[in-house]
Amino acid sequence: MTWELHLLLLLGLGLRSQEALPPPCESQIYCHGELLHQVQMAQLYQDDKQFVDMSLATSPDEVLQKFSELATVHNHSIPKEQLQEFVQSHFQPVGQELQSWTPEDWKDSPQFLQKISDANLRVWAEELHKIWKKLGKKMKAEVLSYPERSSLIYSKHPFIVPGGRFVEFYYWDSYWVMEGLLLSEMASTVKGMLQNFLDLVKTYGHIPNGGRIYYLQRSQPPLLTLMMDRYVAHTKDVAFLQENIGTLASELDFWTVNRTVSVVSGGQSYVLNRYYVPYGGPRPESYRKDAELANSVPEGDRETLWAELKAGAESGWDFSSRWLVGGPDPDLLSSIRTSKMVPADLNAFLCQAEELMSNFYSRLGNDTEATKYRNLRAQRLAAMEAVLWDEQKGAWFDYDLEKGKKNLEFYPSNLSPLWAGCFSDPSVADKALKYLEDSKILTYQYGIPTSLRNTGQQWDFPNAWAPLQDLVIRGLAKSASPRTQEVAFQLAQNWIKTNFKVYSQKSAMFEKYDISNGGHPGGGGEYEVQEGFGWTNGLALMLLDRYGDQLTSGTQLASLGPHCLVAALLLSLLLQ
């Protein structure tokens, strides 16, 4: 089924033509079509992602032909038991096309460990360093030979995955993973991951959300330029930068061409960026949930809802009250309006990328391009200060295009321009500290909450996420004020305390933490909390590197000697 036929099908469902959008990819198995619909709606698996991550045992044409015959026999209403048998006969379990990979550049005892004064934390950091070996993946040759038999996007070089259900690469997760890998002295692994991303830009014009074809039409927060900056700073590999500077520019062009919006403020028009994914149908990896959610809105609004869900996924915050700004009940996921918001963090990331590109081109001797990106950054900075900055509150806020005003709710992303260095007022870090105090954020002792609203979504209270801790901590650390610096350290201490406590109890790191009651693995959202976990490990290593001479494991836990901690960890692993 081509997407044109998909469009006709949607029209047959009563959707207006301007709302009938193309599917996320052409595959009639992994992205749209009757097979996907019947399998996912039958709920053969608890997690919708499981089916679309399974590879085919034979060609797609043969699978579709066999399915068509089965559907005809059952008048297109196949019983669950027969569907289960069909999938078991024609699909292979998740992960068959991947093999575990131990990075060749992994080694014992990287130097940063010596910076950590607390013996318990040093032993723990060694354990985190070892986890890289568990998260390494390499694609089998069959993914390249038979790409149509898998939803995986082929990557030439091995990579580090987040962990748990996420057995493929993810875009913005990889930045914090790479920071941790560089501390672990694994620059070769980082270079391979960077090369994979650069290859994706050359092939598709952008980096998809993750390494599956059903993610192809949406990206994630644009951190590729920053990844390159950290790699070059660590290795001095300017030749690699020079070879790929044009590809970095192409990725930023994708955001300029496809994700910009004009905003009028003070009688002047400004251009800023937003998340926007004009592709229809339920997300394949959350198909049943999206299809059922669509039943709660008028038929003609369903394609818009699905596109907004994809834009929310592109933001990395899937999902959050940040985007639930439409309709009478803002806590309902059906009120999502991601594309109607101008996000502070997205524009901060792009502002930072434009500054880095200017620096890169200067370093490479191309003054014309350096000036171009310097001017782009200046234009964005002016736009952000006019549209997103609130002097009275001392923070930046997402701008609601439909309501014509800022969303003044608390989110750590409100301080992302500070982290990105995208500001002109040198006292802004101290203003940000006052904003945190006024918002009562410093009263939370186990981490910075993702919001102050408990909607049941995973990117809201009471969850706390590693990348958002980083945005605030390193943002405040830019201040020259000793007090603001001290608060940055205390926030780092709080986060390390939570990570270490949970690890000591469960011998695992998690993608998110519930900071409402002493700190434990987070919840909410569309799936169970995942272990691993790439960016959590990366940030923990970053904070241990930065504040290793000050951080402590806590009074109660400090009574355990390092050998006791190791013994406890080994025992827990043996019992698993």
Curated annotation (Swiss-Prot):
Enumerate the residues binding substrate. Answer: R165, W172, D173, N209, R218, S219, Q220, R283, P284, E285, G316, E526
Known catalysed reaction(s)? alpha,alpha-trehalose + H2O = alpha-D-glucose + beta-D-glucose
Q: Where is the lipid attached (GPI-anchor amidated serine)?
A: S553
Pfam families listed in its UniProt record: Trehalase
State which residues carry a glycan (glycosylated): N75, N258, N366
Q: Check the record and name the PANTHER family matching this protein.
A: TREHALASE (PTHR23403:SF1)
Q: What terms describe the molecular function in GO for this protein? A: alpha,alpha-trehalase activity
In what way does this protein cross or attach to the membrane? Lipid-anchor; GPI-anchor
Kindly give the PROSITE patterns that the UniProt entry links to this protein: TREHALASE_1, TREHALASE_2
Please classify the protein's predominant subcellular localization into one broad category.
membrane
Which residues does UniProt mark as catalytic?
A: D318, E511
Question: What function is annotated for this protein?
Answer: Intestinal trehalase is probably involved in the hydrolysis of ingested trehalose.
| Gene Ontology cellular component list | brush border; membrane; plasma membrane; side of membrane
Say if the entry is tagged with keyword Lipoprotein. yes
Supply the name of the protein: Trehalase
What are the record keywords, sorted? Cell membrane, Disulfide bond, Glycoprotein, Glycosidase, GPI-anchor, Hydrolase, Lipoprotein, Membrane, Signal
Q: Quick one: a GO biological-process term for this protein? A: animal organ morphogenesis
Cleaved propeptide residues? 554-576
Q: Cross-referenced Gene3D superfamilies, in alphabetical order?
A: 1.50.10.10
Q: Which family does it belong to?
A: Belongs to the glycosyl hydrolase 37 family.
SUPFAM superfamilies to which the protein is assigned, alphabetical: Six-hairpin glycosidases
| Subcellular location(s) of the protein | Cell membrane
Looking at its record, which EC class is this enzyme? Answer: hydrolase
Range of residues in the leader sequence: 1-20
Q: How does it assemble?
A: Homodimer; disulfide-linked.
Recorded E.C. number(s)? 3.2.1.28
